[in-house]
């Protein structure tokens, strides 16, 4: 098994973003049977969304399945200390049922934790709007000429909230997966992740910042590919949920890789 210091040297040689893309592609395509089973699984989940009364339930199930798989692959990555060759061998032995059920309880509690965090963010957004309203006299309930300004403020805050979620959740997830053992751990570690000193160090790592930019660009490309595929090539619509999962997997795997990089670097010293 690769030592922490060897892992650091590997990051230096490959660049973190390249290593993240390698791990991501190994996860999705190294085991052909697993790839086929994942496509079938997300195609079946897609049908749940076609039933109106099942939409809320389908959304919850989709989140739990996503987290079950991503937690499993992340734990596998941590087990081999970032060694790509060992990770390949582990993926080749992986079965879908094993990946789904191993951390299913953890995925359920983590899903509820993300919901709780999102509600907290929405409350923060609402409070921010109230404060802005008191300062400027312009609220989302403003009518007349100030309505456009109020609407723009609301949109800007929503965009800030959205980008905060998609950039912070993978890092919160990483801290949770690295330190958590029980389903209860996963719930509380995720909710307290914003106060973790280790995660704040990511903001001062140039390697992490540069790699996150590259991964973000690649993730945007996947999203655009999914959009084009679903709208211009209807016969391939059944693949869209698998593509969406692959995008989520990339973002969260990178979160795990970047946080573990800092930990292994500290251990190497």
From Swiss-Prot:
GO CC annotations, alphabetized: plasma membrane
Keyword Protein transport recorded: no
Main location group: membrane
Superkingdom of source: Bacteria
Record keywords: Cell membrane, Membrane, Transmembrane, Transmembrane helix
Residue stretches spanning the membrane: 21-43, 48-70, 121-143, 147-166, 205-227, 242-264
Subcellular location as annotated: Cell membrane
Membrane topology of this protein: Multi-pass membrane protein
Record has Cell membrane as a keyword: yes
Protein's name in the database: Uncharacterized protein aq_1793
Organism expressing this protein natively: Aquifex aeolicus (strain VF5)
Lineage, top ranks: Bacteria, Pseudomonadati, Aquificota, Aquificia, Aquificales
């Amino acid at each position: 098994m690769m030592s922490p210091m060897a892992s650091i040297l590997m990051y230096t040689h490959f660049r973190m973003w390249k290593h993240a893309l390698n791990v991501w592609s190994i996860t999705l395509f190294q085991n052909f049977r697993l790839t086929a089973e994942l496509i079938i699984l997300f195609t079946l989940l897609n049908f749940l969304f076609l039933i109106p009364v099942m939409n809320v339930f389908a959304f919850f199930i989709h989140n739990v399945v996503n987290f079950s798989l991503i937690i499993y692959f992340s734990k596998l990555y941590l087990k081999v200390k970032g060694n790509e060759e060992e990770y390949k061998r582990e993926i080749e032995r992986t079965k879908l049922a094993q990946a789904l059920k191993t951390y299913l309880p953890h995925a359920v509690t983590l899903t509820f934790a993300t919901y709780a965090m999102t509600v907290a963010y929405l409350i923060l957004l609402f409070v921010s709007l109230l404060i802005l309203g008191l300062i400027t006299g312009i609220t989302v309930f403003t009518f007349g000429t100030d309505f456009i300004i109020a609407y723009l403020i609301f949109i800007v805050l929503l965009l800030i909230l959205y980008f905060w979620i998609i950039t912070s959740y993978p890092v919160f997830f990483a801290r949770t997966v690295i330190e958590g053992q029980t389903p209860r751990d996963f719930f509380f570690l995720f909710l307290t992740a914003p106060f973790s000193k280790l995660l704040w160090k990511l903001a001062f790592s140039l390697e992490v910042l540069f790699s996150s930019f590259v991964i973000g660009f690649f993730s945007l490309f996947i999203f655009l590919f999914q959009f084009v595929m679903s709208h211009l090539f209807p016969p391939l619509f059944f693949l869209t949920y698998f593509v969406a999962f692959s995008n989520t997997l990339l973002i969260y795997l990178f979160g795990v890789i970047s946080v573990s990089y800092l930990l292994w670097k500290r251990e190497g010293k």
